[in-house]
Amino acid sequence: FRALDSEMREEVLNFLEDFSLYEELTVGEKQYLLVHGGLGGFTPEKRIEEYSLHDLVWARPDYQKEYFADTNLVTGHTPTQTIPENDNPGYIYKKYHHIAIDCGACFPGGRLAAICLETGEEFYSSDNNG
């Protein structure tokens, strides 16, 4: 970043300022809440607007908890290889209305992943074999 000229730095900062901390989506009949990290300091009464940047970007979710009965929580940030109760590490984890899509591309055997919210179809890159 420091090596960029001032005009390019400003473009990068403007690009980053346009990012949302979360997205709420309705796809078909299903509700989704997309965040990078988790819902730090979660309480059922807390509105999404009340969460801090740290809560949404850096907090790690509790994969044993169902946060919402009527909304699917979609997160990244925590590689699925590190979820203790995950029977299929390195693949998208789905349990308790939670979809974890960070499949550990930085780890040996990890991969990039995506999920189509309309169909549930999962997409993966090739394994990262180190």
Predicted regions and their residues:
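Acidic two-metal-ion nuclease catalytic site recognized across multiple nuclease folds
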Residues: 130
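Acidic, His/Gly-enriched loop-helix segments that form or flank divalent-metal centers
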Residues: 1-100, 104-110, 123-126
